Amino acid sequence: MIESERKQIIDLIKKEVIPAIGCTEPIAVALCVAKAAETLGMKPEKIEVLLSANILKNAMGVGIPGTDMVGLPIAVALGALIGRSEYQLEVLRDCTPEAVEQGKLFIAEKRICISLKEDITEKLYIEVICTAGSQKATAVIAGGHTTFVYIATDEKVLLDKQQTANEEEEDASLELNLRKVYDFALTSPLDEIRFILDTARLNKAAAEQAFKGNYGHSLGKMLRGTYEHKVMGDSVFSHILSYTSAACDARMAGAMIPVMSNSGSGNQGISATLPVVVFAEENGKTEEELIRALMLSHLTVIYIKQSLGRLSALCGCVVAATGSSCGITWLMGGNYNQVAFAVQNMIANLTGMICDGAKPSCALKVTTGVSTAVLSAMMAMEDRCVTSVEGIIDEDVDQSIRNLTRIGSQAMNETDKMVLDIMTHKGGC
């Protein structure tokens, strides 16, 4: 691999694997509000928020960090009151109990209007209009959770969409495939990719914090219980499940704990990281082996998300667990062909799992994905792979990946609409 291409891949990873506090969809909304409020230059009197269906879906039922509250209104209020856009996906890290009380008052005074943006094709779209007196400021995020495509005041446009479109085209020019991902992870100079260890540090700390409390459905904590050990054993496998689900428990409940995200999703970052970390640590792997396995996992996720898109009707845990299955397979001693077998097995098993928004029960889906990742790796190490005569699997692993992403980004669009319709029209539980 030539040095310029390697540098391009490293830049892509550093852009896609970043810290985040809280679920990235409501946090991205808070980020957009913060930018609009900063552009306005004063505390807004009114805030209008227009969202794509996928953003709305992922922000309805998830905890907001530091608030003990669920949903968009408090995220919007805090974005305006204490949010700082320079913090990116940690925009609410300065949140205090006093700020939460101010946010509640802001909501009670009916200063916030949130609605669905009609007639747009973007699945990730956030538009915020902040007003104070006769002054107005607008900010728009589209395509990526931190990608501003439009910023304006009454007087002038500060950022236009064309500038950002050029940047996105530059990213799109980097074409990945599984072989290139594998070769990059295994041959890059270690010091150039050592930064990926930050994912292990942050995401493991999130899991360990979750073990001390009661977050969400406490699935991770439950899996460490005496009864559960009688059923599943005190094994590497049970530890992989407990650590991964615990970090998800804490994040979905709104714990003020940073995690390292992947492609705009904290749960994807967790699922791509912790199974690999736990397997490596409990099998005595070296730091270099851990670094390369983590890089293989995270870059596989980024590669698949390139064609799937950041938000879709397909659960992102499917993609992220596919990455960790690759990392685990390699740590087991697998070669490229066996890593490809693991990917084929994952696609054959989990394609079609719906995304019905970010919420505490995502920990269940994360656990399903991760358990399948281990199973797929074990099959791959026995040279067992779902064949091209079965279902959507192709002889070429990259074509199988494209089949997965076509289903997730195109075929499941009607599913996405139905899921949102159900979520927005159901009665109280």
UniProtKB/Swiss-Prot annotation:
Taxonomic superkingdom: Bacteria
GO BP field: L-cysteine catabolic process to pyruvate
InterPro entries, per database record: Ser_deHydtase-like_asu, UPF0597
Record-linked Pfam families: SDH_alpha
One Gene Ontology molecular-function label: L-cysteine desulfhydrase activity
UniProt-listed PANTHER family: UPF0597 PROTEIN YHAM (PTHR30501:SF2)
Family from the record: Belongs to the UPF0597 family.
Full protein name: UPF0597 protein BT_2080
Organism: Bacteroides thetaiotaomicron (strain ATCC 29148 / DSM 2079 / JCM 5827 / CCUG 10774 / NCTC 10582 / VPI-5482 / E50)
